[in-house]
Each structure stands twice: as structure tokens, then as C-alpha cells.
């Protein structure tokens, strides 16, 4: 990177958006000395995407961000979900590393660490070897045995592949668990947003997520859901208690906006 008297360098961190998450959400229930001495905490990722999505949600619903409770899910090969209250991150699924949280393309998501010594004994793998499997050979790929790509998973599921269906069902199940937890954390939501490759394009996933949530007031419009395309779309029915949105991630635009704000002073 080159600098001169007429240029400046701007660093845009993917972690910055969740920097003021409350301690009760960002810290792990381990000895507090670990957290303080070794910075063991939930850092949160996809922050640039979430900052952009939050602003677009405010614009689409016609209300200031400071007046909104938003649950946003960035679903792709790396997936996470975040709860925002008045523009502030109050909880997020990725943690100390991007391995924690939702089931992903090749990452396991949440995993009981007590399995480590058991797998080490059974397979002969060391810790780096196990972490490699959890990061690159698990998730949709590991369960389905087919692919990390949700499009391939759905196609195989429709052909009757039981492992592909299991992978799809697990992905949706974990996502729904987090969605329910964040609805309780926020005390409800004004908008639920899907972004990222799977979030934007996999209408079957969105359909499965909301398939039984009408009693909670979250009502999907099936036609809008299947037709959703472009930069942004509302896929909720008129009777839904929250706006259900699909917003295309535009992290480059968010980085450019941040750089412009800094340059403008």
C-alpha cells in the first residue's frame, strides 16, 4: 500500500461493528481471568455486511435505525446471525473464531469441545487435524457427502438423497434455534433479514424457516419468497408482525461509505 501527501489508507474491520456488544453476550462462561488475560470473547464477524443491511432495512421500512429491532442472517459458505437493537449488536452467533454458531458450508458450527479427546483417541487425529475437519470437512459438505453448495444439496434432496435432506434439515433447524433465541433476546423483531449467497438465493431455506411460525405472527408470502431477486425484496405477507426481507450484501459499498466519512472528517 502506498501513501502520499494526497492519499490516505483506510482499514475497514469486519469485527468493528460488534465492538460494543454487551459483556453478558460477548464473554464466555469460563474463568473471567481467561477473558481478561487472553482476550477470550465473542468477536463477531460479517460486521460490514450487517452494517450495510441494517441501513438498508431502515430505508426499506421507512423508520430510523434507532427505532428498530432487527435480526439479520448472513448465510453463505460462512454463515452467521446477529441481533440488533437500535443499530447496536446485542448478540451474534460467530464467536472467538468464525467456527462457532450456525451450520455452514464446510464448518460445523457449535460443537461440544469434550468430543475432542474422544475423537483424538478414536482416530489418532491431533487438535490441528480435528480443527481442520471441523473447518473444511464438516457442515453441509460433511453431512451430505455431496457438496458445500446449498443448490447442490437441494437438487440431491429432490432426487431422494437422504443425506442431502438431513443436511438441509439440520441447517434449517440450527438457524431456527438461533432465530428463536434472538426473538426472545430482543423481545420481538421489527424486521428479519436474509443476506449472503444462501440467504438471497435459496428460497427453499427461507420457506422452511418460516413454515410453522404463523402462530408467532411471522408470515411469509410464498409467491414473493420465490420471486425475490435484485438488491432488495420484501417477502412477508401483509399480516406478518415483522417485515421479512431479502437484501443483497454489498460490503464494498459499505467500505466505500466508511472511507468517505473518514476522508470527509
Residue ranges and their predicted role:
Residues 123-167:
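A mobile "lid/hinge" subdomain adjacent to the ATP/sugar-phosphate binding pocket shared
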Amino acid at each position: 500500500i502506498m501513501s502520499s501527501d494526497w492519499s490516505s489508507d483506510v482499514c475497514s474491520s469486519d469485527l468493528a461493528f460488534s465492538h460494543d456488544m454487551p459483556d453478558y453476550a460477548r464473554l464466555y462462561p469460563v474463568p473471567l481471568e481467561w477473558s481478561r488475560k487472553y482476550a477470550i470473547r465473542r468477536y463477531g464477524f460479517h460486521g460490514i455486511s450487517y452494517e450495510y443491511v441494517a441501513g438498508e432495512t431502515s430505508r426499506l421500512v421507512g423508520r430510523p435505525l434507532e427505532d428498530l429491532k432487527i435480526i439479520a442472517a448472513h448465510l453463505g459458505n460462512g454463515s452467521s446471525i446477529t441481533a440488533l437493537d437500535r443499530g447496536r449488536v446485542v448478540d451474534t452467533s460467530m464467536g472467538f473464531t468464525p467456527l462457532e454458531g450456525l451450520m455452514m458450508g464446510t464448518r460445523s458450527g457449535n460443537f461440544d469441545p469434550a468430543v475432542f479427546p474422544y475423537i483424538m483417541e478414536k482416530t489418532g487425529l491431533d487438535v490441528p487435524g480435528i480443527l481442520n475437519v471441523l473447518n473444511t470437512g464438516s457442515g453441509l459438505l460433511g453431512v451430505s457427502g455431496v457438496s458445500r453448495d446449498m443448490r447442490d444439496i437441494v437438487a440431491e434432496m429432490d432426487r431422494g438423497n437422504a443425506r442431502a435432506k438431513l443436511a438441509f434439515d439440520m441447517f434449517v433447524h440450527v438457524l431456527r434455534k438461533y432465530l428463536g433465541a434472538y426473538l426472545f433476546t430482543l423481545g420481538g423483531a421489527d424486521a428479519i433479514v436474509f443476506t449472503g449467497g444462501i440467504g438471497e438465493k435459496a428460497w427453499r431455506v427461507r420457506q422452511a424457516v418460516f413454515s410453522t411460525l404463523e402462530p408467532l405472527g411471522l408470515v411469509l408470502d410464498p409467491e414473493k419468497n420465490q420471486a425475490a431477486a435484485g438488491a432488495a425484496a420484501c417477502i412477508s405477507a401483509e399480516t406478518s408482525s415483522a417485515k421479512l426481507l431479502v437484501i443483497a450484501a454489498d460490503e464494498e459499498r459499505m467500505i466505500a461509505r466508511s472511507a468517505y466519512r473518514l476522508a470527509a472528517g
